[in-house]
A protein has these predicted regions:
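Nucleotidyl polymerases of mobile genetic elements and RNA viruses
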Residues: 1-446, 452, 456
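Short, intrinsically disordered, charge-balanced linker/junction segments flanking boundaries
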Residues: 458-464
């Protein structure tokens, strides 16, 4: 049954659903067939030929989803106390931009460092099929180590262990698969259980850092040392570029792989080194990890590097991304209402994530406004159309005669000001500690200036 069925006929089935959910949670016994799940294979590429080119999505029973969602909502409330501050995925009051700012600030430090006998490096890890490889015994034990009660552990493991799968082939379920490992994409509880699994890796790295065996990187003398950052399955590790620390990091990863079932994808793992490191050292560390060496800032959490020399390239990439979408719309007959929705929901929404982290060049904002303006007035290729109203007028509210389109420059500054406000209002966060130590150690955050050798992240926040 679809969710719409339960919503429409809740007056008739609501009490039965509530009783089923409560009985399952109280007895800790899953009714037979309630956790039967269909797997829908979504192609990752245009013409898939291998099974690895499909993304499996679990289609769970609706009543099971209610049970799982109840547990997920309860778990969500205590994640802030359980998950370490280096991990920001799915944790209330933490955002993906926290990791972005700290990572780019730390990479800026690596890129600008000129002194010191030993260099620094960043290791960007890529784990393959993280959900599918989680060992149930590890999940149960890490949950117990984090202090959860046995009743809670039995409830979560009930959800994990009672599942069975059938694969949808041409819309029909085929076969019956009984798994022994893994979590399922589509289960509301899975992202939070994976956070608990990843906390094991974070704890091992923290233990090495506290013991002084992995030094980590500090953006300045007063700032805390950052040994690693986690966002779901995305992990970045910072340490000295020596074989000694490299071996210790590799030892932690090997132990984590053996315990949790995770597998490091060495082909997609990358290393970024401090400039003055010798080629010999780079090759030794590269051989240890079996990873590739990158020469500039790596893309992190979907954001390209915004360094001075690469800013034009990034601007061109964003413009092309929006431009390709608009070109696809121009060949279709779209009403003015449809054009309005496409501009607001797609063309002007596409760069929002990047605008939340970086100040985009004004020329790029003007180019994006130009693309949206031309699409609004129906301009195709080189055939110019008359713009009967200025773009500035269209960006005003509808009550004032405009269309409510965004002024991208003002929107960019507003998003960055919001990030500055978050840093100011969360004095106990890791993000605040890093920026406070580097840019406003002797003054309040509101009085902070650019300072010496600021990163582009800080320049963007100050500009707002």
């Amino acid at each position: 049954m679809s969710p719409i069925f339960y919503q429409k006929y809740w007056d008739f089935v609501g009490s039965s659903v509530i009783n089923c959910v409560m009985n399952t949670l109280n007895s800790r016994r899953m009714p037979l067939g309630l956790n039967d799940t269909y797997i829908c294979l979504i192609p990752k590429v245009k013409c898939p030929k291998k099974i690895s080119e499909f993304r499996p999505i679990s289609l769970c029973n609706i009543i099971y989803k209610v049970i799982s969602k109840v547990l997920a909502n309860r778990l969500k409330k205590i994640l802030l106390e359980v998950i370490s501050e280096e991990h920001s995925a799915f944790v209330p009051r933490r955002q993906i931009t926290d990791n972005v700012f700290i990572a780019f600030e730390t990479m800026h430090r690596i890129n600008q460092k000129r002194d010191g006998k030993e260099g620094l490096m960043a290791i960007k890890l890529d784990m393959s099929k993280v959900y599918d490889r989680v060992k149930w015994a590890y999940l149960e034990e890490i949950t117990r180590k984090l202090g959860f009660q046995e009743r809670w552990i039995s409830l979560t493991m009930m959800c994990v262990k009672t599942v069975s799968f059938s694969v949808l082939i041409n819309g029909e379920p085929k076969g019956r698969i009984i798994p022994t490992i893994g979590l399922w994409q589509g289960d509301p509880l899975s992202p939070y259980l994976f956070l608990l699994c990843a906390e094991g890796l974070s704890a091992m790295l923290q233990r090495e850092a506290y013991a002084g065996r992995i030094e980590g990187i500090s953006v300045c003398r007063e700032a805390p040392y950052i040994s690693h950052l986690l966002f779901a399955d995305d992990c970045m590790i910072f340490c000295k570029a020596t074989m000694e620390e490299g071996n210790r990091v590799m030892g932690v990863l090997n132990n984590y792989e053996a315990a949790s079932g995770q597998n490091l994808n060495k082909e997609k793992t990358s290393l970024f080194f401090f400039k003055n490191i010798s080629r010999e050292t780079k090759e030794k560390v590269k051989g240890l990890f079996g990873a590739q060496i990158i020469q500039q800032h790596e893309t992190y959490l979907g954001l390209p590097p915004l360094v001075v020399r690469g800013r034009k390239k990034v601007s061109s990439r964003v413009k092309d991304q929006v431009g390709r979408k608009i070109i696809g719309w121009k060949g279709k007959l779209i009403s003015n209402a449809g054009r309005e929705i496409l501009i607001k929901a797609v063309a002007q929404a596409t760069p929002t994530y990047m605008m939340s982290c970086f100040l985009l060049p004004e020329s790029l904002c003007n180019d994006l406004n130009s693309l949206a303006r031309n699409f609004w007035w129906g301009q195709k290729e080189n055939k110019r159309k008359v713009a009967w109203v200025s773009w500035e007028k269209l960006c005003t509210r509808k009550s004032e005669g405009g269309m409510g389109f965004k002024d991208l420059r003002a929107f960019n500054l507003a998003l960055l000001a919001k990030q500055g406000w978050r840093i100011l209002r969360k004095p106990n966060s890791l993000l605040h500690s890093v920026f406070k130590a580097k840019y406003s150690a002797m003054v309040s955050f509101m009085e902070a200036q650019l300072g010496r050798n600021p990163s582009y992240v800080w320049r963007s926040i100050v500009a707002a």
